[in-house]
Amino acid sequence: MSLKTAPVIVWFRKDLRLSDNLALLAAVEHGGPVIPVYIREKSAGPLGGAQEWWLHHSLAALSSSLEKAGGRLVLASGDAERILRDLISETGADTVVWNRRYDPTGMATDKALKQKLRDDGLTVRSFSGQLLHEPSRLQTKSGGPYRVYTPFWRALEGSDEPHAPADPPKSLTAPKVWPKSEKLSNWKLLPTKPDWAKDFSDIWTPGETGALDKLDDFIDGALKGYEEGRDFPAKPATSLLSPHLAAGEISPAAVWHATKGLSRHIASNDISRFRKEIVWREFCYHLLFHFPELGEKNWNDSFDAFSWRDDEKSFKAWTRGMTGYPIVDAGMRQLWQHGTMHNRVRMIVASFLIKHLLIDWRKGEKWFRDTLVDADPASNAANWQWVAGSGADASPFFRIFNPILQGEKFDGDGDYVRRFVPELEKLERKYIHKPFEAPKDALKKAGVELGKTYPLPIVDHGKARERALAAYAAVKKTT
């Protein structure tokens, strides 16, 4: 084969889209046949159950989009190097392209593989597609990484505008013979019995089309009033883009540019607030890039001396949404029912696990990793450490959310609680976030029997707060 006609392998990873996919566009511009491949890597470890559900549907959507453009998606599982070498041998490809990833395992794999393939005379090119800017690009005046969000935001805001999103290729050149592909159904990514994901499709449509639809809906609706509305879980006031960004079904650059030119009918503070959330995701990846053990070790190592409790009974009650605190239970049940949780409530339930129950943040991070459709190695780790007080630019440990007051402030009418904790549906408004304070007649009228139809609190807020502060004080003494 001549250089001009040799196939190019496009290795899809966290970029399951055709639009604004710089690796795919480079393959098309190469001029030869394009062979898209997705590898279920052995070295990457297992995905969480919710992410597996998402991946199945996202790969199906990507496969359909590629077929419409004249291509197809080759699926393979195992060792990435072996699979790519087999594909190169089978197809005669002389070039491999991919979009960069920034988790520690992925970066190590890519670095080693790129060098090995280049040593064999192959062309290997990587592109930016997961973030607005490379995490190594922004540096403090002293040349180091940022550790505080606000200066990071200012630096990014003052840097070059993210690239304008590229259109998808109109067509793909197919090879004369397609390499063998595994069947997606054989990967068994979907739950069977029980089908705990049966309600996911009520709110989620994985894939690039679903991502673009979510973005359009948000721009036309919830972006207006976002700054205030985003904190109220009963309102449809958030973008719901996080799982699409996590899977790479839409690029952050596309989201960023979609908010341009809207100031005539949407307040600038709403646009700025939303962009800051996009940049917070960037900040999380900046931290993970410079501190690869973010998901395993405390950023602030003084927390290594913290005396966590081994309380499996309380942890189980938390995971099941049976703590006796309605706002916490509503969040945990939303997580199980829809694979997501409102951001404000994520902070509340994380604070409750860490500070009310004194359970290690890493247990919570692992649970979220298994149950969130938008589980992300950078955001998940950084946000849990932020709540714990052990992370970069973290909320101080002594900031302990009162789950009753948080519920009353952000779910005043109890609509969120009533939706996900239906056993409290008929309880009157003033008791919806503290059923344990309701008089017997109010409970009876609502059909609530504490300890039977709904649990009593597994911990007293006041006592838990005192215990948490004492544990924190003990750490301060030893550091």
UniProtKB/Swiss-Prot annotation:
Which ranges of the sequence are coiled-coil?
Answer: none
GO biological process terms on file: photoreactive repair; response to light stimulus
Residues annotated for DNA binding in this entry: R230, Q406
InterPro entries linked to this entry: Crypto/Photolyase_FAD-like_sf (IPR036134), Crypto/Photolyase_N_sf (IPR036155), Cryptochr/Photolyase_FAD-bd (IPR005101), Cryptochrome/DNA_photolyase_1 (IPR002081), DNA_photolyase_1_CS_C (IPR018394), DNA_photolyase_N (IPR006050), Rossmann-like_a/b/a_fold (IPR014729)
SUPFAM superfamilies from the xrefs?
Answer: Cryptochrome/photolyase FAD-binding domain, Cryptochrome/photolyase, N-terminal domain
Phenotype of the disrupted gene, per the record: Cells lacking this gene show an attenuated photoreactivation after treatment with UV-B irradiation.
Keywords (alphabetical) are: Chromophore, DNA damage, DNA repair, DNA-binding, FAD, Flavoprotein, Lyase
| Catalytic reaction equation(s) | cyclobutadipyrimidine (in DNA) = 2 pyrimidine residues (in DNA)
Q: Which Pfam families match?
A: DNA_photolyase, FAD_binding_7
Q: Which cysteines are joined by disulfide bonds?
A: none
Cofactor(s) for this UniProt protein: FAD; (6R)-5,10-methylene-5,6,7,8-tetrahydrofolate
- Known EC number(s)? 4.1.99.3
GO MF annotations for this entry? deoxyribodipyrimidine photo-lyase activity; DNA binding; FAD binding
**At which positions is FAD bound?**
226, 238-242, 277-284, 374-376
* UniProt keyword Acetylation present: no
Q: Which residues does the annotation list for site: Electron transfer via tryptophanyl radical? A: W308, W361, W384
Keyword Nuclease in record: no
Protein family (similarity comment): Belongs to the DNA photolyase class-3 family.
Function text: Photolyase involved in the repair of UV radiation-induced DNA damage. By using blue-light energy, catalyzes the photoreactivation of cyclobutane pyrimidine dimers (CPDs), which are formed between adjacent bases on the same DNA strand upon exposure to ultraviolet radiation. Can repair CPD lesions in ssDNA as well as in dsDNA.
Name assigned to this protein: Deoxyribodipyrimidine photo-lyase
